[in-house]
Amino acid sequence: VDINVNSLTFKAINTRGFATFANTRFVQLVDGMDNSAPALNFPLGNLLGMTETDVLSVELLPGASSALYGANAFNGILLMNSKNPFDHTGLSGQYKQGITSQEAAGDNTYRDLSIRFGHKFSDKLAVKANFGYLLGTDWIADSEEDKFGRGLTRADYDHDGINIYGDEVATDIKGVAETLVGLGLAPAGIEQLIPSQVVSRTGYREVDLTDHVAESKKADWGIYYRPFENNFEISYVGKWGTGQTVYQGTNRYGIENFTMSQHKLEVKDDNFFVRTYVTEDNAGDSYDMNFTAININRFWSDSDYFPGITSAELYADGLPSDGDNVWFGTYVSGFAGATLGGATEAQAHAAGRSAADAGIVLAGTAEYERIKQEVINDPDLTKGSKFQDNSKIYHSDWNYNFQDQVDWADIQVGGSFRQYSLNSSGTIYTDYDGPIEYSETGVYTQLVKGFLNEERLTLTAAARYDKNEFFDGQITPRVSLSYQAGEYKNHNFRLGFQTGFRNPSTQDLFIGLDVGRARLIGSSPASLDNYVRDYPVSQNGQALGVPSSVTLDGNSAFNNSFSVASVGAFAATGNPALLEASGVEMVKPEEVKSIELGYRGKLSRNFSVDMSVYQNEYSNFINTQAVLTPYYGSVGDGALSVLA
């Protein structure tokens, strides 16, 4: 079992196969409900999980479990069940306190409180309620190492630190000088003093962008009704959780006041269950730390170098971005002035940065805090960093066991239905015109049959059919044999073949997210058409007859792009023959086929062994692929696209 620690309150569980913090290939069910956040496609730690005082059982099933549990039970599944108030009554609680210690964060108090109350009014009616609260200080990420492994430090011109934010914004200062000369804002010939050198903006540390508070508040409640004198039960369960944490995805995100809720109705007996529930999330005050720093940097004071010129005018002429351009212009002017004064190139760079940084907002000041709050409350990524999301999942499951009708085997059938409603107002998904809705459904059956004396040999066979409205149907069979040896059946040998699949996640299909130096684009055809952006063309490009701006949509990334590796080879050699089309394909459902051989045995009263050997074979594996799309020309034309 792998546990990836993203932050103090956010741990991602995985068993077999590939995973990141955003583990969309592992399912966690709490009393039959998937506790994944609709916007993220994975559980946000234990935000909506159980309190420790209400845990009845936890079962971990490694490997593909799609035959019974459907899409995404790919690497494994964690089944968690809470205590029923008919069986567990009374008031109980738990309090834990300790210290977290880190060189960057120091020593900080950690507190964790859980309270449970259950009451049985009669043999027909029972209720319960739970409350949990956790408070601590999150781990501080403070690495200044260059994220591209170039060995650069903050003293270098193009440093992009792992936990320095805002320095993602960079440009070639020679191009800046040429633009300024072309606009008449700098004397002709000044561009000859400026080297072709990429320079990045001065960034902010993570401690300047978040307070690193780790907090979780959650509550759940349930009403359970048994109208007859048997195990027939009708129940309603509600769950609510909110908290603050840090999430590491493509960028670094401050998750603040993120809220999730679930509401479930279930009817069950010994032979069947029918449940339906809704999961809803709200991004609260969550924000992107990278864009927070980028847009704080854009609150740059007026420059004496360019009186009467607006940053929008500079942006229209090809400088990096509205709000950054004056900084780079000031850098160039400071560099040129120092060079004319006899400075070395290194001294001129220092003079240029010093001149440009004279106008930045200093962390820790009241002005900085005011601007930061303005940025993190604005969802427009050109000047803000706030996430907006209020997505929902509607889900239903049913199952029937024929144990009262069939005595020669254990046979059950079941099915599920899920409806997605994605609503990020265009800040995460390409839902610019309203919520994105789509559905998937599935049915399954399983047979378990015992053979030989005392039914020591057991055959289990299952099959499931699932259909997502964007893809062809998937059939996932599973078959296994287990044999119990020994006088007391204390040696279990098992052999199994199973299949699993994972439908592309909501982000795989519909994401349309700006992450600074790149754009994340999902591969749904509708998403590709909806993702449309305008980009300024440099003066060199305009000299080739290209307009001052171009419009690209998501299709460009898939159908007109170069592979990053080939562009790197071209940049190093200047040989355009090395450029290659990216060849990126649309996502399809992932599939895995697994063969497993295992043994579990109790060798003595105090010693037991559980071991397994397995092999997984994957197809249609989904991953993020970086590509470079030219602003003009067609990939393979050997002309404009190369110049771009």
Where are each of the predicted segments found?
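Residues on the lipid-exposed face of transmembrane beta-strands in outer-membrane beta-barrel proteins
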Residues: 17, 115-119, 219-225, 263-269, ...
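Face-selective signature of the C-terminal outer-membrane beta-barrel domain
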Residues: 264-471
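Membrane-embedded beta-barrel scaffold of Gram-negative outer-membrane proteins
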Residues: 526-643
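N-terminal periplasmic accessory domains that precede
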Residues: 11-17, 26-29, 43-48, 60, ...
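Periplasmic-side early beta-strands and strand-to-turn transitions of outer-membrane beta-barrels
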Residues: 94-256
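Transmembrane beta-strands of outer-membrane beta-barrel pores
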Residues: 97-101, 133-137, 227, 238-244, ...
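Extracytoplasmic beta-strand/coil segments of soluble accessory domains associated
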Residues: 1-34, 56-57
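Short acidic/polar hinge/loop motifs at secondary-structure boundaries
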Residues: 34-62
